[in-house]
Amino acid sequence: MNKTAEELVESLRCASEGLTNALTSITVKVSFVFLATVILLSYYFAVLAIRALWNNNIFSNSTRLILIVCLLNSVVHQSTMMEIRIRQVYRSFVYSSEPCRLPFHFTDCEVELYFYYLTNYFSTYSVFSLTFDRLISYFFPKCYISYPYQVSISLLIIQLVFTLGTYYFGLYGVPKLGYVPICNYAPRLATNFVKINDFRTTIMVFCIIVTIFIYYLNVKSEKQIKRTSYSLGEQYLARENVATSQSVCILIVLQFVCISVSSFGVNYIKSIKSTLSDEEYNKIAPFVVGVTYANLCLPLVIYFKTKLTIRKRRIRIGVMTSVYGDVGEHINRLKKSWE
């Protein structure tokens, strides 16, 4: 078996003509510029999102901690992707006429693969933490309010366990053999990636369904509280739950759409690989990096949702103070109108 694997490695050491044409093509260079732009934008908005969570937080403390950890993970993932693509584009210029020096050996990519796939899976399973954060906030509100950090840390630990388990299933024990065009490609001897993509997709679909259900319950609860309660604290908490559930729902749907680019996209491309030339396949594949796109969507949603919510609050406060005077007077007017 080892001898066969070594022979396979030696036979694939040099890039084919199609692979050489792809790696040195304008298309792959354009993909580098495009992804570099996405990554730089994600850095910028990650800083803005972290500032918003720190200084103008509209989320619960539990949700905020989960989002901050996910943002930090996204920065590591984007940095890893940037380093991978810089190495690839460097080789495409320097070794454009040396096909045997264009591909990367598995050992050349070992560190990048470690960071790339761990942060990739951690980003995917953030939907689990955010979904169950919403579940706990609705069904166990007292516990959620009293122990916000214990809740978020517990969910992040479970998220990490999922991440490590998936990494172990996909890459642990895979022989350090084989060559790949770009270091984020799965090793040639790793065989479980289709199963992993199917599992990730199942988790995300489940989380979307649950989050939409929780959002519906929160909206229904807020309407009931508005009709029956004069407590501003209770009304504020209900409104916060609706806003948070809405944001989480948007995040999970965007994560699903982006990561589906990787999951379904990679599986589909592999299924039709026999109908594509080597050059065509390797021109398309560099664009299919859904988590990189998802890591731009995450800070965008956090930042703009925070700005929008703050703007709505200011407008609402302005209306209340200009039309009804102070809050006490407003409540008295409501009481009279309901008598």
Curated annotation (Swiss-Prot):
Which compartments does it reside in?
Membrane
Keyword Amino-acid biosynthesis among record annotations: no
Q: What is the lineage of its organism?
A: Eukaryota, Metazoa, Ecdysozoa, Nematoda, Chromadorea
Kindly give the Gene3D superfamilies that the UniProt entry links to this protein.
Rhodopsin 7-helix transmembrane proteins
Name under which the protein is recorded: Serpentine receptor class alpha-20
**Gene for this protein?**
sra-20
Q: Does the keyword RNA-binding apply?
A: no
Topology with respect to the bilayer: Multi-pass membrane protein
Query: Mind telling me which InterPro entries this protein's record contains?
Result: 7TM_GPCR_serpentine_rcpt_Sra (IPR000344)
- Provide the transmembrane region boundaries: 30-50, 113-132, 151-171, 199-219, 249-269, 284-304
Per the record, the domain of life is: Eukaryota
Quote the cellular component terms of the Gene Ontology held in the record.
membrane
